[in-house]
Each structure stands twice: as C-alpha cells, then as structure tokens.
Amino acid sequence: GEKYFNDAGRCYQGWQSCNGCHPGDGRTDGMNWDLMNDGVGNPKNCKSLLYSHVTPPNMISGIRAKAEVAVRAGFRYIQFYEPEEEMAECVDAYMKSLRPVPSPYLVDGELSEKAKAGRKVFDKLKCGDCHNGPFYTDLKMHRIGEDVEFEKGWDTPTLVECWRTAPYLFDGRAATMQEVF
C-alpha cells in the first residue's frame, strides 16, 4: 500500500502520487486545492489522511462518505487512473496503519504549560462541541460562517496532530492556530 501511495508512474502523465498532496505518511502539504470533482472555484485546505478511515466523511467538503470510496475516487478523478481493487485495498491498509507522532507539546506524556493554557482557550470557546471524542471530531458537517459556500457546510476535521497541519479552516485562511480565533 505504501508503494502504491507513493507511485506516480501509474497516473495520467506519470507525475502525481497520493504523496504529492499528502506527504510524510499521508499528512497534508499545507496547500489549498481547487479540484474539479466539486466544481471549479472552491479552493479547499488539503486534509491529513491520518485516521481518515475512522473519521468520515472524507475530503473537507464531505463528498466521500467513507475513506475507501475516497481512495478509489482519488485515483479515478484526481490522478485519472483506474486502480485494480487489490491495489486500492493495499492503499486502504497502508492508510489504516498510520499513527500520530508524539506531540512536542507533551512533556513526559503530560501537557506542557503552553498546552494547558491552550486547553483553557479550547474549553472557553467551546471548541469541544464539534472537536470531541478520541479523534477530536464529531464526524459531522457544519456551516462555520456567513461565507460558507456549501449549503451542507464542511467536515469537522480531526485535531489529532493539528500542531503540524497548518493552514487551518476549510479554506486554509488561518495560517496559524492563533488566527483561527
């Protein structure tokens, strides 16, 4: 699965692999992309694929109900390649094997003082209303402002490893966590 995830040779013109947008073991490239599968003019923040198989829906616009569907659609509509089912299953297995790296905000497994201060802000602003549970997501779609383009809103992403997934918000308009607030 890892081999297929990183293999650009099979896609149209042989230049793009899954790793192109999701480098470093399925994380995010920190870019906004305007993909044609949901219409032109809808730039979206590239999500990390960490825990994508247990935090549906997939893609920030929620257009894929499950990660298995998103993997196959990614090959078909982004890389313009029709994968064999066994290949797609291998990529699914690889993505399911990904685990978070230790946070630099933990000291001997405990929150640092900065992280404790951040937790107070998180609680005060009720971030946990949407970012809750073991993966810090309620697995729902939310409209998060007046300028939301999609009527159904946007997927609540996991906050696991959010310290390394800038920019933030569905369209990447917040370059830092401070800009989110």
Predicted segments, located by residue:
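Periplasmic c-type cytochrome electron-transfer domains
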Residues: 2-181
